[in-house]
Design a protein with these regions (language model features):
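Long, intrinsically disordered, low-complexity segments
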Residues: 20, 41-42, 52, 60, ...
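Conserved, well-structured interaction surfaces
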Residues: 40-59, 80-151, 173-178, 187-200, ...
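Short, surface-exposed recognition loops and adjoining beta-strand edges that mediate ligand/DNA contacts
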Residues: 62-78, 157-159, 195-213, 219-298, ...
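Acidic, glycine-rich segments characteristic of secretory precursors and extracytoplasmic regions
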Residues: 2-4, 8, 20-67, 113, ...
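Flexible, polar/acidic helix-loop-strand segments at domain edges
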Residues: 79, 85-88, 317-372
């Protein structure tokens, strides 16, 4: 569904005039009012598809900028990749492209349009209408969840912007308020609306996708018992193929092909009852298909991490040193995750062969947002915080067994912090290159102790990204994050 003319104008005025100009030059714009666009089941489907398209545009580069490049997993790659190096080296200014939130707020506005208009659309099956609405609520929650983790307090819009008014110029809303009063309530609404008997997509939000976001959000809210209970719910959803819809993959070779083959070159598919993935590890991912999105919508997984591309980052020496620790020697994930290639430790998790298989070269590698092992280790952390060390370590053992490693026992730890750090190290290795490590450091407030020796990150406020100067020029009610001052460049 094309963005309506006054929607684009209003959002651009509020958020980024420069981006608006580029957007208008690249895309034809419909003159049809939003209320006239949301009339049929086909309109609803197109409108929801647009949300996923905007999520893909938002995360195409920012998946790495926001979740990976500020962490101890990576070091700068090719000298020509200066944008990435500034983020990695903690030298960001207010004109970084990853500091822009324009596309993210376009996504939020599209979810708001869906939430407003989908309930009034007549459909043959009410369950389909509810499912579209549930996806919209879940995607709005996910968008704001990214926003508060990246910038902290952000402007809050829960109604669609359909015409220009002064109301589009908003101050920033407290991040904890957004988490408590928007993100978690939206996810609870999505939980009640998603069609559990038909929606078996992993490229879209299923009920397990809702629960994955919800569990993650509960961990940020330090609601460990609720996170634990939410992850348990995933075991109740059956697959039409038999067994569970999401589950742990116990074989390391199959774990490897999940990244090199399962995430590659899946066709466009709008049939929610068709689960085209063999791996049940995958819960929700951002899909890339050149036929669907064109050459401007390809994945950066290959270009930014391959020595045959413009390698933006390499795996850091600090990350590699983990495999030298006594209880990590012989980790079967190492050779599947990293390879020394062209004078750098290269992230090879998503690539097969010496350079790449043919599918990688088409740049159609999907980005995993959530998978089941992520949830297991998150649940282990939640249980450790509840004093259930044995149960937490049982979950860790399942993951480490697959990697060919032994696991410490409850008696090997003297404190909850030691158990949590053990789990966080496991998350770091298991989820390398999946946009999770930086957010783990933020959530657990370990970013100072981990990153200060690497890039000097230690001042309060440095953990947030700057707000792009253009947003502040356009909206004087927005105040820059304190670490970056109130400069406009």
């Amino acid at each position: 569904m094309k963005n309506i003319k006054y929607f684009v104008g209003a959002v651009c005025l509020a958020l980024s005039l420069n981006s608006c100009s580029d957007f208008l030059n690249e895309e034809p714009v419909s003159e049809i009012p939003a209320g006239d666009m949301w009339q049929t089941a086909r309109d609803a489907k197109a409108g929801i598809n647009e949300i996923y398209g905007l999520l893909r545009s938002t995360l195409r580069e920012n998946y790495f900028y926001w979740g990976e490049f500020r962490s101890d997993n990576v070091a700068p790659g090719a000298p020509v990749m200066a944008d990435q190096a500034r983020v990695i080296n903690n030298l960001m200014s207010t004109d970084e492209k990853c500091a822009k939130w324009t596309t993210l707020y376009q996504m939020i506005n599209q979810t708001n349009l869906a939430i407003k208009y989908v309930p009034n659309i007549s459909m043959p099956d009410v369950a389909d209408r509810n499912d579209y609405l549930g996806q919209a609520y879940a995607l709005r929650a996910l968008a704001y969840f990214y926003a508060i983790r990246v910038w902290g307090d952000v402007p809050l819009f829960i109604e669609p912007t359909e015409k220009y008014s002064e109301a589009i110029y908003k101050e920033r809303t407290d991040k904890n308020y957004i988490l408590e009063h928007v993100i978690l309530p939206d996810l609870k609404k999505a939980e009640s609306l998603i069609n559990r008997n038909k929606n078996y997509e992993r490229k879209r939000i299923s009920i397990c996708g809702v629960w994955a976001i919800m569990a993650d959000a509960y961990m940020w809210a330090e609601e460990y018992n609720l996170a634990d209970q939410t992850i348990d719910k995933m075991a109740t959803i059956a697959s039409k193929k038999g067994g569970r819809f999401v589950d742990f993959e116990p074989n390391i070779a199959t774990w490897h092909t999940m990244f090199t083959e399962e995430l590659n070159n899946k066709p466009s598919d709008d049939t929610p009852e068709n689960d085209e993935y063999n791996s049940r590890e995958l819960i929700f991912l951002v899909h890339f298909n050149m036929d669907e999105v064109g050459t401007n919508g390809y994945s950066y997984m290959y270009q930014w991490f391959s020595g045959s591309g413009n390698r933006a980052a390499v795996i850091s020496d600090k990350f590699m040193s983990i495999f030298d620790e006594k209880d990590m020697k012989g980790d079967l994930r190492k050779d599947y995750t990293v390879k020394n290639y062209q004078n750098g430790n290269e992230l090879r998790k998503y690539m097969a062969g010496d350079i790449s298989n043919s599918l990688n070269k088409t740049c159609e590698v999907a980005y995993p947002i959530y998978r089941y092992t992520d949830m297991m280790l998150l649940q282990a952390e939640a249980r450790a915080h509840q004093g259930k060390w044995g149960e937490a370590l049982d979950l860790v053992k399942t993951v480490r067994d697959r990697a060919g490693l032994n696991t410490l026992t409850e008696n090997d730890f003297a404190s909850e912090e030691e158990v949590v750090n053990y789990i966080l190290r496991e998350r770091q290795v298991e989820l390398a290159g999946e946009g999770r490590r930086w957010f783990d450091l933020l959530r657990t407030e370990k970013w100072k102790e981990v990153m200060k020796p690497i890039n000097g990150m230690e001042q309060d406020g440095n953990e947030l990204f700057p707000i792009h100067y253009s947003h502040i020029l356009e909206n004087p009610k927005i105040v820059q994050n304190t670490y970056y001052g109130n400069t406009n460049n």
